[in-house]
Design a protein with these regions (language model features):
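A conserved FAD-binding loop/helix module that cradles the flavin
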Residues: 287-337
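C-terminal auxiliary extensions adjacent to catalytic cores
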Residues: 7, 339-392
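A Rossmann-like FAD-binding core segment of flavoenzymes
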Residues: 80-88, 103, 175-271
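Helix-biased detector of long, well-ordered alpha-helical tracts
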Residues: 388-742
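FAD-binding core/adjacent interface of flavoenzyme oxidoreductases
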Residues: 1-10, 77-158, 232, 243
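FAD-site-proximal beta/loop scaffold in flavoenzymes
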Residues: 126-153, 236-304
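Beta1-alpha1 glycine-rich phosphate/pyrophosphate-binding loop at the start
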Residues: 2-79, 158-159, 167-198
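FAD-binding beta-loop-beta segment adjacent to the flavin cofactor pocket
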Residues: 265-282, 326, 342-348, 441-443
């Protein structure tokens, strides 16, 4: 999944809009060998905008109306970068991201939607709630709805914008809230739904009246203060909550790009959806405007532009003539009415009824299903790299015979680019490191300390190289923390695939920067490393630490009567395995990543504070495998409470579908040490005891009289899944080391 194939060209997609989801699915079904897709989006889900009113009304759940971008990108072998774009450098073919390294591209496409634009209204920020970006609006709406549902006080809500969006949203709010709250719709036009048939306008004016929604027309908003709308006609309107559903503009980050934009900041494109400024930049949806005609912002255009965009991206890579996009002059518009009623309009015709809503519902759900119900079996296998990509460098990389030994080292040019400007935090006890490199690093070890050394490395388990670098650093440092050591230095081990130099250097740099961000926080200095070419990426670290001789936390220090505490939930193995098969929900993957990004440093400090002297980190051998390591040199047995073991969201579901990590079957052989395993071996929770963990939590023995204090302290310090999972007792049978209790 995480690009084992050769990367020659990078297609970068900004935004998970309706056009881009079509492109991503198409490349999953029919990839171009050598082209790597990367989607950058601030959220792991993409709302199908036509279903937004249905969410507000309560007709749809979150999952009903959203496309899972993690499943889609996993299906299509597309990298997913959860991030915020803050700029584009077209001259350097780079996209600048907030809080992480930039990404380079050979072809860039932008389908990230528009922003609300109310520059002419004073004091609007932090008071009014714009509908765009939609995810921010939905979280605000959820908060307000919850407030209203738990209060008897009538609330005064104002919506500004008399177009289809404003009308749909205010009628949906009425349906959701009932009649006890005051709703007002304000438009600067002399009528609502400008451009729609008279009959459609009549239907909705009548509907607003019947549902006690005030309609204020021909009002220009001058200023919005807290609780008051001030108009140019010196007529004020009071409100508790105000929503903006009208004017839009391009995002702020696009304005500093030196690309051709219109007055509202939208990207200007030609009829091939290509930027007027740069031929390797495309755009679609609400973020674009055409240079030769006006096209109103509507989801139907973005959906249909997706097909042309997909064809033109493919043709651009093959240096072929691009297709022209020809928007339809008229299209069917369906506007919902809050309840399960809707109005359909085309030309001068209008139709109203429940059947219209159910028709729209069928269309919308069908669209969502195309991108959420995916099967990897549908994908074509095409390994042949297009001739146009076969530069001298690429041809050389594809030679049958590649050297071993030192002839397989990464080129100096790759290393120089990757190691430039890494911002490594320095320690006083590092004598020679990367700032003054030599044949080896030199490190001071104080007379009263011992040196601890550990090593770990593995292939990527997620597609984002920066996140992968962070997780790998946490995982490698965890062994030191489990011993009670203070990390000191790290040396990188990196096997790099056969890609062009500039692709490799950026990939390596992203991984290193992710790791260094963690190392700097953990007071660990990167002092060197080694790179070699390989079939796929492998990455990790040899880490060293310092420890007092009398403060070593050994696995075998468990005592009779100790309570067993686990600091993190288990389940990363099965969730990551499901993600590789496009079977994991985005929220599950997000939670698993958040868990892996939590350092074990503070948890070990807390464990020591409350008398813990035995601990280990839970990694590849799973909870049972690592617990057995703690027990094997003792005369003790562990009583495990299966119901108390914390489990990551979704892990029970994925493992019950027999989606397991590669090491799972071998780990399950540890069952022979469990006294009563046959009572539980069909339970998904039992299977998770053997799930291999990446950057897992700490398992420790704590004296019984300090358990509650220890758990409270762990919870206060961000270890919210910390639980007591069992007790250690005296062993009666040599073969049995674990007993599971209900």
């Amino acid at each position: 999944m995480f690009y084992k194939k050769q990367v020659i060209k990078d297609l970068l997609l900004i935004g998970g809009g309706h056009s881009h989801i079509k492109v991503i699915k198409s490349f999953g079904m029919n990839p171009i060998p050598g082209v790597r897709l990367t989607l950058i989006n601030p959220d792991m889900y993409s709302l199908y905008s036509g279903m937004l009113p249905g969410i507000i009304s309560g007709h749809y759940s979150f999952d009903d109306a959203h496309i899972d971008l993690i499943k889609l990108t996993s299906y299509s072998n597309c990298r997913f970068i959860k991030g915020k774009v803050i700029g584009i450098q077209p001259g350097d073919n780079r996209v600048i991201l907030e809080g992480r390294p930039p990404l380079s591209y050979d072809l860039l496409s932008i389908n990230s939607g528009s922003s609300s634009n109310y520059k002419e209204i004073e004091d609007i920020d932090n008071i009014a709630i714009p509908v765009k970006p939609i995810n921010n609006f939905l979280s605000q709406w959820k908060y307000i709805k919850n407030k209203i549902d738990n209060s008897k006080k009538e609330r005064n809500i104002v919506v500004i914008g008399g177009g289809a969006g404003g009308v749909e949203i205010i009628t949906a709010m009425r349906h959701s809230l009932g009649e006890k709250n005051s709703l007002t719709l304000i438009t600067k036009e002399n009528k609502i739904l400008s451009g729609f048939p008279k009959k459609t306008i009549h239907y909705f004016e009548d509907h607003l009246k019947k549902n006690k929604i005030k309609l204020i027309k021909e009002i220009e908003i001058k200023k919005i203060t807290k609780g008051k709308v001030i108009s140019t006609k010196e007529k004020d309107f009071l409100f508790d909550d105000i929503f903006l559903v009208a004017q839009t503009a391009g995002p702020q980050w696009l304005k500093g790009s030196n690309l051709s934009l219109n007055d509202e900041g939208f990207l200007l494109v030609n009829d091939k959806l290509q930027s007027l400024s740069k031929e390797n930049i495309f755009g679609s949806g609400d973020i674009i405007d055409f240079d030769n005609y006006n096209l109103k912002k509507a989801g139907v255009y973005a959906v249909r532009q997706g097909d042309v965009l997909n064809k033109n991206i493919r043709k651009y890579f093959q240096n072929k003539i691009l297709h022209k996009y020809k928007p339809q002059k008229n299209f069917l518009s369906i506007i919902t009415m809050g309840s399960k009623n809707a109005v359909a309009s085309k030309y001068s015709l209008s139709f109203k009824g429940k059947w219209v809503w159910y028709w729209k519902n069928y269309i919308d759900k069908n669209f969502i299903a195309k991108f959420n119900n995916l099967s990897i079996k549908d994908m074509k296998i095409n390994e042949r790299i297009p001739k146009i990509f076969l530069t001298k460098e690429v041809k050389k990389l594809n030679e049958d015979i590649r050297c071993g030994g030192c002839g397989a080292k990464a080129a100096r040019e790759i290393l120089n680019l990757a190691l430039d400007d890494l911002n490594i935090k320095k320690r006083d006890d590092i004598v020679i490191g990367l700032d003054n490199p030599d044949d080896a690093s030199i490190i001071k070890i104080p007379n009263d300390k011992l040196s601890t050394i550990s090593l770990d490395f593995f292939p990527p388990m997620i597609s984002d190289p920066y996140l992968f670098g962070q997780i790998t650093a946490h995982h490698c440092l965890s062994d030191l923390y489990a011993m009670g050591a203070e990390p000191q230095s790290a040396m990188a081990i990196s096997c790099l695939p056969l890609w062009p130099k500039h692709k490799l250097s950026e990939e390596l740099k992203s991984m290193l920067l992710g790791s260094i961000q963690v190392f700097n926080n953990e007071n660990t200095q990167l002092v060197g490393g080694h790179t070699s070419e390989a079939e796929q990426c492998i990455y990790g670290f040899s880490v060293t630490g310092l420890i007092n001789k009398d403060k070593i936390l050994s696995k075998s220090n468990l005592k009779k009567g100790d309570a067993l505490i686990l600091t993190k939930a288990i389940g990363t193995g099965t969730i990551l395995a499901a993600n590789m098969r496009a079977k994991a929900n985005a929220s599950w993957v997000d939670n698993a990543i958040e868990s892996m990004l939590v350092s074990n440093r503070m948890s070990v400090d807390i464990i020591k504070k409350y008398g813990g002297i035995a601990c280990t980190d839970i990694t590849g051998f799973g909870l049972i495998g690592h617990l057995l390591e703690m027990l094997e040199r003792t005369q003790l047995i562990a009583n495990l409470n299966l119901e108390n073991i914390p489990i990551l969201d979704g892990a029970d579901e994925t493992i019950s579908k027999k989606i397991i990590s590669t090491l799972q079957d071998n780990n399950e052989k540890f069952s022979r040490y469990i006294k009563n395993y046959s009572e539980f071996n069909k339970s998904p929770n039992y299977k998770l005891l053997f799930d291999p963990q990446t950057a897992g939590g700490i398992l420790a023995g704590i004296p019984e009289d300090h358990v509650d204090e220890c758990l409270n302290d762990l919870t206060k310090n961000n270890y919210t899944n910390a639980r007591r999972i069992g007790t250690v007792e005296e062993q009666t049978n040599k073969e049995e080391k674990i007993y599971i209790i209900k």
